[in-house]
């Protein structure tokens, strides 16, 4: 039993909790720097050639589970360890401290009051009358008063003692919510072109919701850089009326526990006309080797596929650059503009179809995280409330009042308030 108590004492140590908080904060910072939940090939390709911080390559990153840090075994273990430390601290320290604060302490001898942080002795004409007067004054100021025939005890701000326990409770709820979200949360990233739909299924395979992208627009600055993306979505729940919602960056859609973020944009297709052919909508592919935001396609100019040209663009506004097989620029084409003859064929770009990058997240732990955060804030605010206590003993033989006081914070403020109370009693019964 002694060994178990020693283990509990170590686990509930404040220094350990602070160290765990710092470790979790540092790990969370790493998670915001490194890409999360990407394909393993990305980490191997990117970090084997250029190790992170010059130390950790792609293989080590996967081995340490840094590709899914927030759901990694060691990160969840840190959360569980901190939660256990907080619960033990609450059980061993905060709860007994709250119980002790709720109990009335009955001092019966003046000598006991003289040892308190604040102590005064007041001479008066009638000590019993002064005691009753002081009790009335304290009650009028919002103090709780417990009065006996020759003494009283009063206190104010006991609610402040609940604060630390609420802080611990809120942090534990927050940790549980974070762990639950990491283990049971779902995340899906998809690019949708206007008119395309995405069906979301429940675990049984039934259609739960259909998302249709009705429109997608990109707002650009004068230099052509994307400033804002906006998607108009139609939500079609089975057996219910459709809903139309608009989302943009920093303005997500929340629907039945799911959050849809406007996360990115892309180019889906280019519509071209070759000679007198009908309009052809051709899919675009990314070319990372040419740049971060470069899309293009290879277009043959002969029936046998020979003499191909490469069409590339970086914006839905164009231009579309046309390159020959030797890499030389042939021409630039504007969407909706005039066509140009390329390798003997009239080529015209009708338009470029952008795609909306949507991030869908379902995190069942969010309500617990929000509740824990709110309780933690409430507990922190209550912890700032000073708990003040006053004891008064009437000495009817010598017609004196012996007054003592304690305060857990802002002792100077209490030291200024106590003489004011004494002066009021002195005036009435001096």
Swiss-Prot record:
Membrane association type? Multi-pass membrane protein
Keywords from UniProt, A to Z, are: Cytochrome c-type biogenesis, Membrane, Thylakoid, Transmembrane, Transmembrane helix
Q: Where are the transmembrane segments?
A: 14-34, 72-92, 162-182
Which BP terms does GO give this entry? cytochrome complex assembly
Superkingdom is: Bacteria
Query: What's one Pfam family the UniProt record gives for this protein?
Result: ResB
Q: Name one GO cellular component term.
A: plasma membrane-derived thylakoid membrane
Carries keyword Cytoplasm? no
Q: Which InterPro entries match?
A: Cyt_c_bgen_Ccs1/CcsB/ResB (IPR023494), ResB-like_domain (IPR007816)
Cell compartments where the protein resides? Cellular thylakoid membrane
Q: Does the keyword Transmembrane apply?
A: yes
Say which family it is in: Belongs to the Ccs1/CcsB family.
Q: How does it assemble?
A: May interact with CcsA.
Role according to the record: Required during biogenesis of c-type cytochromes (cytochrome c6 and cytochrome f) at the step of heme attachment.
Q: Name the PANTHER family on file.
A: CYTOCHROME C BIOGENESIS PROTEIN CCS1, CHLOROPLASTIC
Q: What is this protein called?
A: Cytochrome c biogenesis protein CcsB
The organism of origin for this protein:
Synechococcus sp. (strain WH7803)
């Amino acid at each position: 039993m002694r060994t178990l108590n020693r283990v509990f004492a170590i686990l509930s140590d404040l220094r350990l909790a602070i160290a765990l908080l710092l470790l979790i904060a540092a790990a969370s910072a790493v998670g915001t720097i490194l890409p999360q939940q990407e394909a393993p090939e990305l980490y191997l390709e990117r970090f084997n050639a250029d190790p992170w911080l010059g130390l950790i390559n792609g293989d080590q990153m996967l081995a340490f589970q840094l590709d899914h840090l927030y759901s990694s075994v060691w990160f969840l273990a840190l959360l569980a360890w901190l939660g256990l430390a907080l619960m033990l601290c609450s059980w061993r320290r905060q709860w007994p401290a709250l119980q002790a604060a709720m109990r009335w302490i009955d001092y019966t001898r003046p000598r006991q009051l003289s040892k308190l942080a604040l102590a005064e002795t007041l001479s008066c004409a009638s000590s019993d009358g002064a005691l009753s007067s002081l009790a009335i004054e304290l009650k009028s100021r919002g103090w709780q008063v417990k009065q006996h025939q020759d003494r009283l005890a009063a206190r104010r701000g006991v609610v402040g003692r609940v604060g630390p326990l609420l802080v611990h409770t809120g942090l534990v709820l927050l940790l549980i919510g974070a762990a639950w979200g990491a283990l049971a949360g779902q995340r899906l990233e998809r690019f949708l072109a206007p008119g395309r739909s995405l069906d979301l299924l429940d675990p049984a395979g039934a259609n739960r919701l259909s998302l249709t992208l009705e429109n997608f627009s990109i707002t650009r600055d004068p230099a052509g850089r994307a400033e804002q993306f906006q998607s108009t979505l139609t939500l079609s729940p089975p057996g219910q009326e459709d809903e139309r919602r608009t989302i943009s960056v920093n303005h997500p859609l929340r629907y039945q526990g799911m959050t849809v973020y406007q996360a990115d944009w892309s180019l889906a297709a280019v519509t071209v006309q070759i000679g007198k052919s009908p309009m052809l909508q051709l899919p675009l592919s990314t070319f990372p080797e040419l740049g971060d935001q470069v899309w293009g396609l290879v277009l043959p100019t002969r029936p046998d596929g020979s003499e191909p040209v490469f069409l590339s663009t970086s914006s839905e506004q164009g231009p579309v650059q046309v390159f020959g097989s030797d890499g030389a620029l042939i021409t630039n084409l504007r969407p909706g503009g005039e066509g140009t003859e390329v390798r003997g064929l009239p080529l015209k770009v009708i338009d470029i179809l952008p795609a909306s990058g949507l991030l869908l997240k379902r995190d069942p732990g969010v309500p617990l995280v929000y509740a824990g955060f709110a309780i933690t804030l409430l507990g922190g605010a209550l912890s700032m409330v000073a708990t003040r206590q006053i004891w008064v003993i009437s000495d009817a033989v010598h017609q004196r009042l012996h007054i003592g006081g304690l305060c857990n914070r802002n002792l100077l403020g209490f030291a200024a308030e106590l003489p004011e109370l004494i002066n009021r009693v002195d005036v009435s019964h001096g």
